[in-house]
Amino acid sequence: MILPCESFNGVPSGCLIIEMNWYSVLKASTAIFFPEKYSSSTSSLSKRSPISAPMINVDGEYLKIFAGRIKLMKAVILAAGLGTRLGGVPKPLVRVGGCEIILRTMKLLSPHVSEFIIVASRYADDIDAFLKDKGFNYKIVRHDRPEKGNGYSLLVAKNHVEDRFILTMGDHVYSQQFIEKAVRGEGVIADREPRFVDIGEATKIRVEDGRVAKIGKDLREFDCVDTGFFVLDDSIFEHAEKLRDREEIPLSEIVKLARLPVTYVDGELWMDVDTKEDVRRANRALVSAAVKGSGDGFISRKINRKISTRISAAIVNKVNPNQMTLISFLVGAFSALASFFSIPLAGLLYQFSSILDGCDGEIARASLKMSKKGGYVDSILDRFVDFLFLAIIALLYPKTATVAMFAIFGSVMVSYTSEKYKAEFGESIFGKFRVLNYIPGKRDERIFLIMIFCLLSAISLQWIFWMFLFVAAISLTRVVVTLLAVLVSK
């Protein structure tokens, strides 16, 4: 079903594109035009506020509506800086965490924004050329006075926005968690617990009665720091106009003059990128934040991630997720072939491939390049490497063939049970049954165990038999526990 509104990105920006039966369509239509009929807790229209659209629950599907359509704001991105501290490279086009700063910002804001107004000067053509094939609804507003400051850049956007709009900086990096909270705020979005910025360089704010009382980098007493993100309305230009004749118009002066309200988004990832060292710090922060919240085994949490995140941070701007998947696969396949020459060496390479296997996901999430296709290919290649490694060792030591068969079967079934659950129920089995996060037998744990036994095989080949036996035992036990958990669940 499509409820058409304004066009955005080739698709109506205010539309709902959902699969619903006609009964649900009727309920949705009734709710839009007769919201009082949906005032219960299970199917309700929330109170309208100036900063967030109401939500309605229709057969479990929350639909955001605003007078019959989704309410989206415009977003102004100030990108008129000279980029002098980054070797003349336009800051918005600097790649951080595998994604250009302005592209990251626009991707994360897209669900909330109808049009982007990008205020640029010297690098306007470069930014336009970069964005023209990205599918965004945007407008470049040019001016030739970047030396007048970011407050003047805001003034330049005056005739291109109305009502409420988002204002952000072209050299700031934000996480998705920050954006989702910030767009629901009002005025200055500030942070009382900044974890990723140099406080000495940050713009500090003194708050009184919930509004900006003082603002500046040199404040000795302050309550929070400015994140470079604002949710404003067009009344801000009345205050900006009072400063128009100044040689330089800092945005902070406009903020102080307007006594903007302050909304706190504390402790989330955000930072401004001014230097090459900032780029490196942002890479590390974005990759660390990209570690998936569930599904990792004990070895991944305690060992692998500590290494893989460092590797990912070093290469995130040079390698895409698919290339990283291929590299991990090739190392894994080579580890299997190395068994013909040295079992201990093969085990070490196998463990290294397991560490690298975490990098593609970290890079994909950090660079906002996640895809179902990439996850599918990665999963298939992992199964291939696991089978190849164990099969070659079983071939080299045929006396272990029977127990090796159970080890290979169990290894495949561990992955199959979790992937099949996700396919059938549409959610991660590790989120549903958290106890499975602590039962041994995940891929990272099996590979680490295999490495240990491969190293011990240098002392006695009898350890090869015990390797297969242990892998079979923990993997099949995990499969049985998983099945029981699903069967007894409601």
Curated annotation (Swiss-Prot):
Binding site for Mg(2+): 180
Subunit structure: Forms a mixture of monomers and dimers in solution, with prevalence of the monomeric form.
Biological process annotations from GO: phospholipid biosynthetic process
Protein purpose: Involved in biosynthesis of di-myo-inositol phosphate (DIP), a widespread organic solute in microorganisms adapted to hot environments. Catalyzes the condensation of CTP and L-myo-inositol-1-phosphate into CDP-L-myo-inositol, as well as the biosynthesis of di-myo-inositol-1,3'-phosphate-1'-phosphate (DIPP) from CDP-L-myo-inositol and L-myo-inositol-1-phosphate. The cytidylyltransferase is absolutely specific for CTP and L-myo-inositol-1-P.
UniProt-annotated location(s): Membrane
The reaction(s) this protein catalyses: 1D-myo-inositol 3-phosphate + CTP + H(+) = CDP-1L-myo-inositol + diphosphate; CDP-1L-myo-inositol + 1D-myo-inositol 3-phosphate = bis(1L-myo-inositol) 3,1'-phosphate 1-phosphate + CMP + H(+)
PROSITE patterns reported in the protein's UniProt record: CDP_ALCOHOL_P_TRANSF
Region (MobA-like NTP transferase): 72-290
Residues given in the record as CTP binding sites: 78-80, 91, 144, 180
Activity across pH: Optimum pH is between 6.5 and 7.5.
Main location: membrane
Transmembrane segments: 329-349, 389-409, 447-467, 468-488
Stretches the record annotates as CDP-alcohol phosphatidyltransferases: 291-490
Swiss-Prot/TrEMBL keywords: Magnesium, Membrane, Metal-binding, Multifunctional enzyme, Transferase, Transmembrane, Transmembrane helix
Thermal dependence of function as given in the entry: Optimum temperature is between 90 and 95 degrees Celsius. The activity is undetectable at temperatures below 60 degrees Celsius.
Family statement: In the N-terminal section; belongs to the MobA family.
Protein name per the record: Bifunctional IPC transferase and DIPP synthase
Entry-linked PANTHER family: BIFUNCTIONAL IPC TRANSFERASE AND DIPP SYNTHASE, MOLYBDENUM COFACTOR GUANYLYLTRANSFERASE
EC number: 2.7.7.74, 2.7.8.34
One Pfam family per UniProt: NTP_transf_3
NCBIfam families: IPPtranDIPPsyn_Thcocales
Cofactor: Mg(2+)
Membrane topology: Multi-pass membrane protein
Entry's Gene Ontology cellular component terms: membrane
GO molecular function, one term: metal ion binding
